[in-house]
């Protein structure tokens, strides 16, 4: 796995699923392939994206700044600086300075990542802020190691939270989760169907599913009534794809 592939993997792991994630993935691919060289436009685009947390925007902004060549005097962006200030906690800043001193002596990606993993996410964000604000300089590989360590910590906590929700025994939460998943699956079906003539059937199935979810929410239904809803939808989607000559088995 190449260094940039690894960085892309870690960064995308903290971006919520949805159309925006696909857009960000495309931007990262373009940046890493040297196709997108307008840092100013890229940062303006990132700043106005909805849904993303300030920290995720800060990390993405840091990645773009490290990767896209730019004029030396290019202004640093406030939304990135604010996200990478470690919540203004002086303890985070103290730890960030100690971490920076270690990273300054480290030239490899994996070495930097190993060192960074022993620090809290707040200290890691502050350390990124130091480098972003040109208060310190490390090798690009070390900076990428720092980014990936931060993403790993964030992804770990997201995974713990997700696992708690998935394994909850509360039937109301499970019911709502199934309906949300069915609704997002229906939305994905509508987007994938596009405008081809054969798409009408898939669009119809997706539309009916979304109407059903809306009705279930409006009138209130038994928590078990949503069981299997998402899987039914996915089976419909796979049947449609088969007829279109597309084989995608890894949705479930």
UniProtKB/Swiss-Prot annotation:
Alphabetic keyword roster: Host nucleus, Membrane, RNA-binding, Viral matrix protein, Virion
GO molecular function, one term: structural constituent of virion
Motif (Nuclear localization signal): 101-105
Highest taxon of source: Viruses
UniProt-annotated stretches for the region Membrane-binding: 1-164
GO biological process: viral budding from plasma membrane
The keyword Membrane appears for this protein: yes
A cellular component annotation (GO) from this entry: membrane
Family annotation (SMART domains): Flu_M1_C
Subcellular location(s) per record: Virion membrane; Host nucleus
SUPFAM superfamilies reported for this sequence: Influenza virus matrix protein M1
Protein family (similarity comment): Belongs to the influenza viruses Matrix protein M1 family.
Subunit-structure text: Homodimer and homomultimer. Interacts with NEP. Binds ribonucleocapsid by both interacting with genomic RNA and NP protein. May interact with HA and NA. Cannot bind NP without genomic RNA.
HAMAP family, per database record: INFV_M1 (MF_04068)
The protein's name: Matrix protein 1
Lineage, top ranks: Viruses, Riboviria, Orthornavirae, Negarnaviricota, Polyploviricotina
Originating gene: M
């Amino acid at each position: 796995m190449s260094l940039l592939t690894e960085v892309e993997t870690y960064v995308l792991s903290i971006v919520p699923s949805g159309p925006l994630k696909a857009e960000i993935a495309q931007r990262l691919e373009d940046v890493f392939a040297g196709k997108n060289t307008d840092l100013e436009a890229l940062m303006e685009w990132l700043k106005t994206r909805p849904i993303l947390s300030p920290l995720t925007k800060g990390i993405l902004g840091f990645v773009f700044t490290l990767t896209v060549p730019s004029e030396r005097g290019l202004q640093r962006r406030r939304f990135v600086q604010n996200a990478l200030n470690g919540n203004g906690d002086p303890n985070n800043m103290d730890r960030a300075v100690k971490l920076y001193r270690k990273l300054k002596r480290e030239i490899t990606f994996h070495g930097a990542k190993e060192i960074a993993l022993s620090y809290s996410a707040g200290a890691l964000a502050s350390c990124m802020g130091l480098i972003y604000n040109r208060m310190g300089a490390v090798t690009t590989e070390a900076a990428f190691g720092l980014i990936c360590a931060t993403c790993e910590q964030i992804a770990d906590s997201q995974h713990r939270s997700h696992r708690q929700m998935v394994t909850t025994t509360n039937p109301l939460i499970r019911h709502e989760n199934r309906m949300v998943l069915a609704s997002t699956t229906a939305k994905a079906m509508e987007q994938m169907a596009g405008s081809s003539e054969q798409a009408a059937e898939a669009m119809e199935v997706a539309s009916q599913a979304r109407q059903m979810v809306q009705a279930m929410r409006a009138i209130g239904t038994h928590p078990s009534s949503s069981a299997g809803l998402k899987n039914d939808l996915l089976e419909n989607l796979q049947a449609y794809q088969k007829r279109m000559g597309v084989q995608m088995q890894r949705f479930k």
